[in-house]
């Protein structure tokens, strides 16, 4: 019984502690609709506002509290996002009209050194600080671009300078590979050459004249190389046969002439000179000696060219630069090896018996006249009266 009494007394105390219920709302006036209360809709809570990072000397800024219910209005927007004269509608279920949000005034420490009414100035200063912080990167990019553009211009100027630099006409290298010489009359891009390149070209070609301007190089032999430094040259099969023929002919000629002289003047060969068989041998040996002499003369030029090539390889040479005054003097004396031009009328080619190689008085131009004669024979099938107009033909003849 005591427990039941205690429960009843506690219930009575709780009923007394509860506030009284509010009175029902008065009925609406006639002619208006009755508002039926509805249960509030569920709205998720808003995320927590970001905390503003404040310096050590700045006071903390009061942040707006979180919204606790659907009937509570939204917190005001920061001044940087919403001007002071903009109106927004509170997101609630109270069906209220548009409401002007109160302006939040930030302290001077948060906005900078300006007045409280200048929040945008602080943002501008902050942007300026960010801009000044980004300046080194921009400057580095610009400097890298300028350096790259400067490097490109330097590279182009270097290519142009290298293009205008004199180069060797054999190896196409510049003066860094050696001293460049001007050994002949050639001009332009084929004017210069290296000493070693030209000597190697002369040794391979076997000629002391330029293949372009036909100028004979002025070279001086310094000394012969040591025997251990001698180099072999490349020769063809025909040149090998010519060399063997000249060597064998020379050996036979030396042996034959030596025996003939001993038989003719030695007192120990008196009986040989009186014998008829030895007299026949003398005639045969004399004929063979003449054949050997002709063979040596005929093939000696080729062997001499091979010897000159070998000598050019195994000698220390010094090529001299082209001297125009010396060239003019040689040309005036007729010692120049340049090509000559013959101007002949075109009607001379129509006459078959006008020019003949046997009528030449100077053997230096025989090659050119032979070419003219062959060209005349090739035109034999053409009609002579077909073209009676006057004209000229230019034939370039090189002295051999």
From Swiss-Prot:
Ranges of compositional bias, category Pro residues: 19-31
Give the protein name, as stated in the record.
Answer: E3 ubiquitin-protein ligase MARCHF11
The alphabetized list of GO BP terms reads: protein ubiquitination
Looking at the Swiss-Prot or TrEMBL record, what is one Pfam family this protein matches?
A: RINGv
Q: What does the record say about its membrane topology?
A: Multi-pass membrane protein
- Could you describe the subunit structure of this protein? Interacts (YXXL motif) with AP1M1. Interacts (via PDZ-binding motif) with LIN7A. Interacts with unidentified fucose glycoproteins.
Decide whether keyword Phosphoprotein is in the record: no
Q: Which organism is it from?
A: Mus musculus (Mouse)
Q: Which residues bind Zn(2+) 1?
A: 168, 171, 194, 197
Q: Name one GO cellular component term.
A: cytoplasmic vesicle membrane
The UniProt annotation places Zn(2+) 2 binding at 184, 186, 210, 213
């Amino acid at each position: 019984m005591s427990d039941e009494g205690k429960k009843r007394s506690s219930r009575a105390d709780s009923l007394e502690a509860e506030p009284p219920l509010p009175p029902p709302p008065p009925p609406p006036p006639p002619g208006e609709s009755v508002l039926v209360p509805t249960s509030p809709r569920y709205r998720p809570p808003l995320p927590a506002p970001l905390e503003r990072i404040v310096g050590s000397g700045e006071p903390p800024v009061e942040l707006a509290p979180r919204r606790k219910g659907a009937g509570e209005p939204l917190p005001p927007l920061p001044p940087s996002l919403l001007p002071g004269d903009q109106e927004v509608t509170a997101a609630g279920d109270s069906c209220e009209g548009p409401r002007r949000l109160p302006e939040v005034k930030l302290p001077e420490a948060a906005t900078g050194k300006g007045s409280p009414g200048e929040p945008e100035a602080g943002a501008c200063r902050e942007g300026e600080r960010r801009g000044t912080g980004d300046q080194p990167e921009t400057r580095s990019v610009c400097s890298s671009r300028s350096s790259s553009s400067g490097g490109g211009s330097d590279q182009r100027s270097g290519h142009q300078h290298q293009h205008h630099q004199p180069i060797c006409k054999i190896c196409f290298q510049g003066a860094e590979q050696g001293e460049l010489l001007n050994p002949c009359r050639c001009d332009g891009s084929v004017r210069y050459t290296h000493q070693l390149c030209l000597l190697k070209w002369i040794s391979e070609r076997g000629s002391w004249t330029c293949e372009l301007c036909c100028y004979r190089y002025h070279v001086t032999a310094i000394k012969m190389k040591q025997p251990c430094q001698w180099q072999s040259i490349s020769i063809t099969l025909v040149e090998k046969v010519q060399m063997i023929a000249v060597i064998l002919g020379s050996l036979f000629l030396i042996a034959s002439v030596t025996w003939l002289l001993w038989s003719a003047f030695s007192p120990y060969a008196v009986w040989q000179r009186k014998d008829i068989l030895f007299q026949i041998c003398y005639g045969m040996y004399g004929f063979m000696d003449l054949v050997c002499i002709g063979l040596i003369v005929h093939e000696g030029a080729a062997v001499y060219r091979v010897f000159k090539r070998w000598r050019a390889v195994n000698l220390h040479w010094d090529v001299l630069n082209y001297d125009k005054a010396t060239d003019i003097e040689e040309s005036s004396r007729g010692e120049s090896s340049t090509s000559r031009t013959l101007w002949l009328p075109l009607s001379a080619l129509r006459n078959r018996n006008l020019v003949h190689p046997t009528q030449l008085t100077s053997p230096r131009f025989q090659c050119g006249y032979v070419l003219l004669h062959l060209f005349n024979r090739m035109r034999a099938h053409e009609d002579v009266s077909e073209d009676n107009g006057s004209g000229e033909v230019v034939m370039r003849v090189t002295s051999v």
